[in-house]
Amino acid sequence: FYSFYSNYLKEADFTTTEIGFLWAVGVIAEIIMFAYAHLFLSRYSLKNLVSLCLIMTSIRWMVAGLFSNSFIAQFAAQTIHAFSFGLFHLIAMRMIFQNFSAGQQGRGQALYSTMWGLGVAFGSILAGHYWKIYGGSIIFISASGIVLLGLLWVKWLPSQFEQPISMRN
């Protein structure tokens, strides 16, 4: 997403001002999520929230792929960044905090950053390879489906992530 979204919008004849504005919408949505995430974290299990983040990411990428020429649709898709990155990142930090000792939390964050970076790199390489063959819309729609495979991973999260944070000891 990060590697190709601006180019994708440029191909759809968005101005650089509109592209910059849409990126700002995503950042603002993320900041709002950081401010209010406690409402989600205190009410819902981390397993359910990870599932929600994956589903919202799929919706975001599907909207981006299906409505490439619609500023309103892209605006709406960018607000989902609150879930596709903001809430997911907070959940990852919470999992690191709970599963790594104080002295090992830096390593936990390094592991998370490495896995995130490898995912971005691998996804960017694949998207770049297939972009000219299939076009941006198909790439975003395909990514929308692929991200749902992450839901299979969620069932293997440890049982300690099945309760809201407020319910844990």
Whereabouts are the PLM-identified features?
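Helix-to-loop junctions at the C-terminal end of transmembrane segments
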Residues: 32-46, 131-132
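Loop-to-transmembrane helix entry/capping segments in MFS-fold secondary transporters
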Residues: 16-17, 100-112
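A membrane-interface helix-boundary motif in multi-pass transporters
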Residues: 129-147
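Helix-loop junctions at membrane interfaces in 12-TM secondary transporters
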Residues: 65-77
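Multi-pass alpha-helical transporter architecture, strongest
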Residues: 142-169
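Helix-loop boundary and gating motifs at the non-cytosolic
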Residues: 1-22
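Intracellular juxtamembrane helix-capping segments at the cytosolic ends
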Residues: 87-100
